[in-house]
UniProtKB/Swiss-Prot annotation:
Record carries keyword GTP-binding: no
Originating gene: aatA
Organism: Dictyostelium discoideum (Social amoeba)
Annotated transit peptide: 1-29
Summary of the function given for this chain in its UniProt record: Plays a key role in amino acid metabolism. Important for metabolite exchange between mitochondria and cytosol.
Localization annotation: Mitochondrion matrix; Cell membrane
Repeat among keywords: no
Family: Belongs to the class-I pyridoxal-phosphate-dependent aminotransferase family.
The protein, known as: Aspartate aminotransferase, mitochondrial
Quaternary structure note: Homodimer.
């Protein structure tokens, strides 16, 4: 009887503990639903719309004349070469595919870059541009402690989030002038000069996102001088090489100028837009150093940082870019194709302005053609953007940014007519 009583008591005690434990399994009751990404939200609204006239001007990916995703012919040929080579699927090193890293640095900095020739550069493969920026932010948090990152106002939305998540304070410098839809160079240089010595200055190498507004060569020179005088550390976000002007060399001019001026920059590259490899998530992060020993030290620390982050990068995108850039014929084909994409975007800018005038708009839309790259800051107000969505089924972000890649010969006049209507008397 005593043993039975103890057994019953133990069972009841166990059941009580189980009940107590089960009440503690609801770990996530305090997690609230987060806000939707404002850019991705545009596509969600577009997909819900059933109108045959709908246009998505929020997507950050190139589309062909028929509004379809575009796979470059040089990528198809590189893909075929890789398949026929019957390559394995082993892990890449932590730093990624070495040949890709070398070619990526050469594409951005030029084959004659002294840092490359003298091995005064540490380059690692990254998970596209976002991954490169995250590596940069985490590295700066460890080795540029106490520094603040300065980003243009406005800038790509992920910049602030990435630096904040890495524990780096973020401030902005003047960049865009809403009155002219152009560069506020005076505010930009004033703010960069006023930043504490040794600050981190993030610059868009070309095709500024979201405005499409870039400094001139003379303005870049002045920015370089100010950064040097103030001892600032310069980080370039280089997501659109070749995609802005159609010339990889022209688009790299600012980056190469800063290096020639003596800046040991950091560089974040993406191969999503210019190679059409969005889903392959292929990028690179580089730091230029004073000596080759410093480059080795930096690389060793980057490996330590990357190992618990994602350990090893995916190899396929790197193999594609490598296959193209190491083959002269494929490289020339890529140059031709990236120019073709850039030229189509430039042409759509011109067509949009032409049709805006045709439909009676008296506003000055010249900024549409002076801005460059995939995106255009139209100057439309949030209320006008809402009207475009509600009345015309045209979707874009509420700051007035449109993706020119979403425009083609079949929808450009409809877009212009709608823009003329919502901006009438404004």
């Amino acid at each position: 009887m005593i043993r039975s009583a103890r057994l019953i008591s133990n069972i009841k005690f166990g059941q009580k503990n189980i009940r107590q434990f089960s009440t503690n399994t609801n770990w996530w009751a305090n997690v609230q639903k987060g806000p939707e990404d404002p850019i991705l939200g545009v596509s969600i609204a577009y997909n819900k719309d059933t109108s045959p006239s709908k246009i998505n001007l929020g997507v950050g990916a190139y589309r062909d004349e028929n509004g379809k995703p575009y796979v470059l012919d040089c990528v198809k040929k590189a893909d075929k070469k890789i398949y026929e080579a019957n390559v394995d699927h082993e892990y890449a090193p932590i730093v990624g595919v070495a040949a890709f890293n070398q070619l990526a640095a050469q594409l951005a900095l030029g084959e004659e870059c002294k840092h490359i020739k003298e091995k005064r550069i540490a380059t690692v493969q990254s998970i596209s541009g976002t991954g490169a920026l995250r590596i940069a932010a985490d590295f700066f948090a460890r080795f540029l402690k106490g520094k603040t990152a300065y980003v243009p106002n406005p800038t790509w939305g992920n910049h602030n989030v990435i630096f904040n998540d890495a524990g780096i304070p973020v401030k902005s410098y003047g960049y865009y002038n809403p009155a002219t839809c152009g560069l506020n160079f005076e505010a930009m240089t004033k703010d960069i000069a006023a930043a504490p010595e040794g600050s981190i200055i993030l610059l868009h190498a070309c095709a500024h996102n979201p405005t499409g507004v870039d400094p001139t060569a003379e303005q870049w020179k002045k920015i370089s001088e100010i950064c040097k005088e103030r001892g600032h550390f310069v980080l370039f976000d280089f997501a659109y090489q070749g995609f802005a002007s159609g010339s990889p060399e022209k688009d790299a001019a600012a980056v190469r100028m800063f290096v020639e001026d003596g800046h040991n920059i950091a560089l974040c590259q993406s191969f999503a837009k210019n190679f059409g490899l969005y889903g392959e998530r292929i990028g690179a992060f580089s730091i230029l150093t004073e000596t080759s020993d410093q480059a080795l030290n930096v690389e060793s620390q980057l490996k330590i940082l990357i190992r618990p982050m994602y350990s090893n990068p995916p190899v396929y995108g790197a193999r594609l870019v490598q296959a193209i850039l190491k083959d002269k014929e494929l490289t020339n084909e890529w140059r031709s194709e990236v120019k073709g994409m850039a030229d189509r975007i430039i042409n759509m800018r011109e067509q949009l302005v032409k049709y805006l005038k045709k439909h009676g708009s008296t506003r000055d839309w010249s900024h549409i053609t002076t801005q460059i790259g995939m995106f255009c800051f139209t100057g439309l107000t949030p209320e006008q953007v809402d009207r475009l969505a509600n009345e015309y089924h045209i979707y874009l972000t509420r700051n007035g940014r449109i993706s020119i890649a979403g425009i083609n010969s079949t929808n450009v006049e409809y877009l212009a007519k709608a823009m003329a209507a919502v901006t009438k008397d404004n």
